[in-house]
UniProtKB/Swiss-Prot annotation:
The keyword Transmembrane applies. It comes from Saccharomyces pastorianus (strain ATCC 76670 / Carlsberg bottom yeast no.2 / CBS 1503 / CLIB 180 / NBRC 10610 / NRRL Y-1525). InterPro entries: ORMDL. The gene is ORM1. Pfam families: ORMDL. One of its GO terms (cellular component) is endoplasmic reticulum membrane. This is Protein ORM1.
Length: 148
């Protein structure tokens, strides 16, 4: 299955590694302050995880007979069982990153607004049970993102 790697050893560590690498990458740019570095790290991680877990439907492997063609990776995790340890971890990571980025942005209103909006509407809301199998189409932005 497409999402079995989420439960394997080391899958949780990769999120910390990706966040650390993003932070180091944004620190390399001259003129980027610590506030913007953390905000850009948060934005990149949140948008990347949205694309990976919620935008693309299906599976790259063809030995499942099309059973997962209409499911996102988030819906494929743990056979659609809600509130498993992996799902809880994937909900907590963006929230923790939001808190860290807000702290290092010295609670600046502009940075807080960016971080809060993205974390809430791009990272947390799509993972809630109320949005399970809910498809929202935004013309020009969300098209047919399906692996076939």
């Amino acid at each position: 299955m497409n999402a079995t790697w989420v439960d394997q050893r080391g899958a949780w560590i990769i999120h910390v590694v990706v966040i650390t690498l993003l932070k180091l990458f944004f620190n390399l740019f001259p003129g980027v302050t610590a506030e913007w570095s953390w905000t850009l790290t948060n934005m990149t991680y949140v948008v990347g995880s949205y694309v990976m877990f919620h935008l693309i439907k299906g599976t790259p492997f063809d030995f499942n007979g099309g059973a997962y063609d209409n499911l996102t990776m988030w819906e494929q995790i743990d056979d659609e069982t809600l509130f498993t340890p992996s799902r809880k971890f994937l909900i907590i990571v963006p929230i923790a990153l939001f808190l860290v980025s807000t702290h290092y942005a010295h609670y600046d209103l502009k940075m807080f607004s960016w971080n809060c909006f993205l974390t809430t509407f791009v990272a947390v809301v799509p993972k809630l049970p109320v949005t399970h199998r809910l498809r929202i189409s935004i013309p020009g932005i969300t098209g047919r993102a399906q692996i076939s």
